[in-house]
Amino acid sequence: MDDKFASKFEIDVLNKLLNKNFSYDLAIILKKIGGLDYRKKVFINGECIGILEFDLIDLDWKFHPYASYYLIEEPKIKIKPTKRKLKGKKVPVDLIENAEELKDINENDYVGVEVGNYVGVAVKKGDTIKIKDLTLKKELRFEKIEDYLRKNKDRIEKLEKKSLSIIKKYYEMCKNKNYAINTSFSGGKDSSVSTLLANKVIDDLEVIFIDTGLEFKDTIDFVKKFAKKYDLNLVVLKGKNFWEYLEKEGIPTKDYRWCNSVCKLEPLKEYLKKYKRVYTIDGSRRYESFTREKLTYERKSGFIENQINIFPILDWRGTDVWSWIYLNDVIYNELYDKGFERIGCYMCPAALNAEFLRVKELYPELFNKWVDVLKRFGYDEDEILRGFWRWKELPPKMKELKKILENKEKK
């Protein structure tokens, strides 16, 4: 799965949860893992210290520490040296040196432990604790992003060289066969990188941005700023009126994204029909999702007959994209610093629910406008806040969540 540097927002979340003061220049790596919503492993210098997730039951951020977290946090509970196997076991109270500390810990809460040359994580169980995991004591040093970049510079340059060769190959072919070539640009980090790489190779590159009418103002402003700074030949296409189609099609969902066809593909198809064949450079990467992991460098569009998409940064991870941006001092959309991973329509059903609730915090007018629509279509507040509206047919994990919430209400 994909990885990335922790954003300013994510570092703020970690600092609040852990009562820490991590600085924004630290190379804290987050790796996506399966879950109901936002769920990522947190790495410091290659060591996983725990899992950061957005809890859809409590609608709040949670941190689940691993044993390695207590390499940077003083363990609260001291256990007497023993030859007993402790991992996965409840600890007899007489082995706990400072058992009085347990009275301030809630049932099932995490607590750090120290036993001899080991530190670890446990959970409170009754009048004692149960050890979840232990790790040998060692120094865990923080790495700064600038140090990470210095160590990985050669690898990033190799990725760039390969991507440029892919673009050159298709550009030469298009010139020889008199085919058109352009690039799609969303205002996000991936298409920023693929666009700038293509701009190094292709003369008078046509850069296509589709304004669906549902983008954040931040994105519209950034697209203009980006095009001006890098002297791009920007073409802005307007999407069809989403609100008109909404009444006929209903709420767009992850399993029925009619909005993508109406607001993006239809106007693009209309614009590209002047070409016999067109190759479009796209910033999609295989690590972004399970649906993209089987992509190859070239794919015929399933919607636009004369379009073929090419993916020059297909093999890049999220940290590679950000590394290239930092190494080349490239400007990026500030929405990434505010807690958004998906740069697109503000109420996109494919976005995380954690992101949708960030819209509530930062852009209440947009949030309330969409909430009013959802209520008009019959969704209640619980379904809205927990993101049930994002599916036409709920997947098993969301059906299970619904049952948990219903049982909580009965109690």
UniProtKB/Swiss-Prot annotation:
It comes from the Archaea. Keywords: Oxidoreductase. SUPFAM superfamilies: Adenine nucleotide alpha hydrolases-like. GO terms for molecular function: oxidoreductase activity. Transmembrane segments: none annotated. In the C-terminal section; belongs to the PAPS reductase family. This is Uncharacterized protein MJ0973.
